[in-house]
From Swiss-Prot:
HAMAP family: PSI_PsaA (MF_00458)
Database matches in InterPro entries: PSI_PsaA (IPR006243), PSI_PsaA/B (IPR001280), PSI_PsaA/B_CS (IPR020586), PSI_PsaA/B_sf (IPR036408)
Organism from which the protein derives: Morus indica
Function: PsaA and PsaB bind P700, the primary electron donor of photosystem I (PSI), as well as the electron acceptors A0, A1 and FX. PSI is a plastocyanin-ferredoxin oxidoreductase, converting photonic excitation into a charge separation, which transfers an electron from the donor P700 chlorophyll pair to the spectroscopically characterized acceptors A0, A1, FX, FA and FB in turn. Oxidized P700 is reduced on the lumenal side of the thylakoid membrane by plastocyanin.
Amino acids binding [4Fe-4S] cluster: 573, 582
Annotated Pfam families: PsaA_PsaB
Recorded GO MF terms: 4 iron, 4 sulfur cluster binding; chlorophyll binding; electron transfer activity; magnesium ion binding; oxidoreductase activity
Amino acids binding chlorophyll a': 675
Upper lineage: Eukaryota, Viridiplantae, Streptophyta, Embryophyta, Tracheophyta
Family of this protein: Belongs to the PsaA/PsaB family.
Binding site for phylloquinone: 692
Name listed for the protein in its UniProt record: Photosystem I P700 chlorophyll a apoprotein A1
Subcellular location field: Plastid, Chloroplast thylakoid membrane
Length: 750
């Protein structure tokens, strides 16, 4: 007789038909809240409706219901993303010069939008080359399409339709998993299973399928394109997949199929899975064979990682065990209890994810120019500048969001009674030391970084250039940064002998790569000017961290307001009779942090824009002489504040200011309009609520006189609402102003 362990019972992890589908709720704005559902008495109602519509915590305290709402909303978000993506591909198919660009990417600009001839605005359709008139785009889609092997507009149409189908599918999934088969709380908390599926499925199989697409479709098509074959002559993607002989003509080892893989003779595949480093001199992008190799390697790593965690089979890691074992001699209970926090507080989970994703997005910004991944991306200066700026802004917002949700976690989900002597408790107990030290660092960095500039401005104003900090007077060379550059430049001979070139040309050592007479990339020299602005970066980032971290660590209590947790995440003041307690809520710290995030990112993108125009981007003559856009003026001019104002902001704003009457005039209008939006924000930020309430009451009096007063009583925005509207317009106005300034400049000179 065989003794077998009893079969594990299959756990039912969904509830069937938990909530009936009804459109009646749609007709009842605010149905999620008893107060808001009553309808408006005052105009504050519409603001509360918007503030609370997605604040699922305030609608129910049932964690399972909150989880289901968030899960369902994610499908809605994915649906919108697919819809947007479909629109991008449709524009490429219907309104773009993609096929013309593909035939001559160095002389023809990418355009996917043609303005209708109404009120004379067809002036905006500039000549992008090849006889096509339209708006030059800087999103990088053309370069991605070429890299993925798209050769005609029909393929773009098909992809656009495919994305629409997926958008519909996601909408359906959002409805289905809330109304028909809603997951139980246990399913959302099963982190090992989630890790396995996300690592092996999303990242592992996702990377593997992309690597497969690159090898079987992108590489052969790009090989033909680089050789100058007419796109119409190139076999279609499915022909490469179905007919191995076609691929074997380009890569002979394909004739052997999978034999080398199973006989461990992997070097046979080195034709299309390379380890070259550097850039392809034809396109100025990374070698696509390097990229395919990278995705294959990443896929293996994630497929292994997706089998590491313990689920039904009793082998593998358990996250709870890992966290609880993680303690050192000086950290008390270490990470004990963190598992419970992260499986019951989605704010804590989201906070970590936002912090990591934000940092990763900023890493992406820096890799897009130093290791340009797509063909002809590096020589499209407008796209390079846009991609860097875009990813920097996104990263900044995500990191502030991380602090916001960390603070919401502290206020709503943190239970101090169950936490003792773990890392979080220890950090909270010595928060005064952390914040006061951080404050000292900010003061030190602020005075010293700005002080170096003020010294230079003073010496420059007094006509004493020999006493300035610059490469030609008192040098402050960034020796550590230069050492890192050299280490990487020498890596192919030393630490990475398999590579022929270092990871990025920017490290130094290598020659420049030019495509079609334009510089793609070259070694980037760092000097005193970079040393100075680097310390401004350090200063602004530390101040942002100070504000955000103070908001998180003092979200529940402070010496000023010991019971802050009872007042909630956002509140204007600690009630009447408590002077000097306004603007101390966790929300207010996020509000202030946003301004410093804006400062930080602005300095970074200004530094990038000027540095690249001065020391990297430009044209190259037949004799090999490089002429940079601003002629290398960064090293001398950017060492004074006056230099930044005069030689960067003012000198480079001439294109946007003089754009009227040209195809760039839309940027001139946006520059003006965005300045106005920015200035409009100051009206909300620099005035008090009482002022507006008094004004409104006068206006209501006039309406009553004329018997046209509305039933809904007008009210001034609350203090928090006013600041929210203010910071929104400040950021949108500032970002749109910068966008217009950058693009008008780089499209005109790039």
């Amino acid at each position: 007789m065989i003794i077998r362990s009893p079969e594990p019972d299959v756990k039912i992890l969904v509830d069937r038909d938990p909530i009936k589908t009804s459109f009646e709720e749609w007709a009842r704005p605010g149905h999620f809240s008893r107060t808001i559902a009553k309808g408006p008495d005052t105009t504050t109602w519409i603001w509360n409706l918007h503030a609370d519509a997605h604040d699922f915590d305030s609608q129910t305290s049932d964690l399972e219901e909150i989880s289901r709402k968030v899960f369902s909303a994610h499908f809605g978000q994915l649906s919108i993303i697919f819809l947007w993506l479909s629109g991008m591909y449709f524009h490429g198919a219907r309104f773009s010069n993609y096929e013309a660009w593909l035939s001559d990417p160095t002389h023809i600009g990418p355009s996917a939008q043609v303005v209708w001839p109404i009120v004379g605005q067809e002036i905006l359709n500039g000549d992008v080359g090849g006889g096509f008139r339209g708006i030059q785009i800087t999103s990088g889609f053309f370069q991605i399409w070429r890299a993925s092997g798209i050769t005609n507009e029909l393929q773009l149409y098909c992809t656009a339709i495919g994305a629409l189908v997926f958008a519909a599918l996601m909408l359906f999934a959002g409805w289905f998993h809330y109304h028909k088969a809603a997951p139980k709380l246990a399913w959302f908390q099963d982190v090992e299973s989630m890790l396995n599926h996300h690592l092996a499925g999303l990242l592992g199989l996702g990377s593997l399928s992309w690597a497969g697409h690159q090898v079987h479709v992108s590489l052969p098509i790009n090989q033909f394109l680089n050789a100058g074959v007419d796109p119409k002559e190139i076999p279609l993607p499915h022909e490469f997949i179905l007919n191995r002989d076609l691929l074997a003509q380009l890569y002979p080892s394909f004739a052997e199929g999978a034999t080398p893989f199973f006989t461990l003779n992997w070097s046979k595949y080195a034709e299309f899975l390379t380890f070259r480093g550097g850039l392809d001199p034809v396109t100025g992008g990374l070698w696509l064979t390097d990229i395919a190799h990278h995705h294959l390697a990443i896929a293996i790593l994630f497929l292994v990682a997706g089998h590491m965690y313990r689920t039904n089979w009793g082998i593998g890691h358990g996250i709870k065990d890992i966290l609880e074992a993680h303690k050192g001699p000086f950290t008390g209970q270490g990470h004990k209890g963190l598992y419970e926090i992260l499986t019951t507080s989605w704010h804590a989970q989201l906070s970590l994810n936002l912090a990591m994703l934000g940092s990763l997005t900023i890493v992406v910004a820096h890799h897009m120019y130093s290791m340009p991944p797509y063909p002809y991306l590096a020589t499209d200066y407008g796209t390079q500048l846009s991609l860097f700026t875009h990813h920097m802004w996104i990263g900044g917002f995500l990191i502030v969001g991380a602090a916001a949700h960390a603070a919401i976690f502290m206020v709503r989900d943190y239970d101090p009674t169950t936490r003792y002597n773990d890392l979080l408790d220890r950090v909270l107990r010595h928060r005064d030391a952390i914040i006061s030290h951080l404050n000292w660092v900010c003061i030190f960095l602020g005075f010293h970084s700005f002080g170096l500039y003020i010294h230079n401005d003073t010496m420059s104003a007094l006509g004493r250039p020999q006493d300035m900090f610059s490469d030609t007077a008192i040098q402050l060379q960034p020796v550590f940064a230069q050492w890192i550059q050299n280490t990487h430049a020498l890596a192919p001979g030393a630490t990475a002998p398999g590579a022929t070139t270092s990871t990025s040309l920017t490290w130094g050592g290598g020659d420049l790569v030019a495509v079609g007479g334009k510089v793609a990339l070259l070694p980037i020299p760092l000097g005193t000017a970079d040393f100075l602005v680097h310390h401004i970066h350090a200063f602004t980032i530390h101040v942002t961290v100070l504000i955000l971290l103070k908001g998180v660590l003092f979200a529940r209590s402070s010496r000023l307001i010991p019971d802050k947790a009872n007042l909630g995440f956002r509140f204007p003041c600690d009630g009447p009779g408590r002077g000097g307690t306004c603007q101390v809520s966790a929300w207010d710290h996020v509000f202030l942090g946003l301004f410093w995030m804006y400062n930080s990112i602005s300095v970074v993108i200004f530094h990038f824009s000027w540095k690249m125009q001065s020391d990297v981007w430009g044209s190259i003559s037949d004799q090999g002489v490089v002429t940079h856009i601003t002629g290398g003026n960064f090293a001398q001019s950017s060492t004074t504040i006056n230099g930044w104002l005069r030689d960067f902001l003012w000198a480079q704003a001439s294109q946007v200011i003089q754009s009227y009457g040209s195809s760039l005039s839309a940027y001139g209008l946006f520059f003006l309009g965005a300045h106005f939006v920015w200035a409009f924000s100051l009206m909300f930020l620099f005035s008090g609520r009482g002022y507006w309430q008094e004004l409104i009451e006068s206006i209501v009096w006039a309406h009553n006189k004329l018997k046209v007063a509305p039933a809904t009583q007008p009210r001034a925005l609350s203090i928090v609402q006013g600041r929210a509207v203010g910071v929104t317009h400040y950021l949108l106005g500032g970002i749109a102003t910068t966008w217009a300034f950058f693009l008008a400049r780089i499209i005109a000179v790039g």
